[in-house]
Amino acid sequence: MKIMVINGPNLNLLGIREKEIYGAKDFNQVIDYIKEEGKELGLEINCFQSNIEGEIINFIHNAYFKKYDGIIINPGAYTHYSIAIYDALKGVEIPTVEVHLSNIHKREEFRHKSVTAPACIGQISGFGEYGYIMAMNALKKHIKSK
């Protein structure tokens, strides 16, 4: 089972940016953790990160053309306003889980709304990097049940 993990803007700054919110692990440590846990679950995990909306959309399109079974996406700030990412997710019809390291509902009001989540089968928020593992388990179960 192939899963694409897409991380959006500023996630490459993990371990540098607002450690009290996002944790002390750097981006590469989080990616290594995701890949290790994915392997234990029998998943093929490929991770991508971009600060550019169009590149994120290209990753989503590539997931379709390369026949990925699922997508895990942390759109970063694009969560709150990217209709283009929403449209890309809806367009490829690949089961997707949206993940956020912090609880977006406990933060600034402008972070409470996700325009991308309605294109997903679910959203996981507030569990740090473990949210990605929760998403892998949820996707695996969802895909197997089809």
Swiss-Prot record:
Any one GO biological process: chorismate biosynthetic process
Matches recorded under Pfam families: DHquinase_II
Record's keyword annotation contains Transmembrane: no
Active-site residues (renumbered): 22, 100
EC number in record: 4.2.1.10
One Gene Ontology MF term: 3-dehydroquinate dehydratase activity
Reactions mediated catalytically: 3-dehydroquinate = 3-dehydroshikimate + H2O
UniProt xrefs under Gene3D superfamilies: Dehydroquinase, class II
This protein's UniProt keywords: Amino-acid biosynthesis, Aromatic amino acid biosynthesis, Lyase
Family matches, as CDD domains: DHQase_II (cd00466)
Residues binding substrate, per UniProt: 74, 80, 87, 101-102, 111
Quaternary assembly: Homododecamer.
Cited NCBIfam families: aroQ (TIGR01088), PRK05395.1-2 (NF003805), PRK05395.1-3 (NF003806), PRK05395.1-4 (NF003807)
Family statement: Belongs to the type-II 3-dehydroquinase family.
Protein name per UniProt: 3-dehydroquinate dehydratase
Organism: Clostridium perfringens (strain SM101 / Type A)
UniProt lineage: Bacteria, Bacillati, Bacillota, Clostridia, Eubacteriales
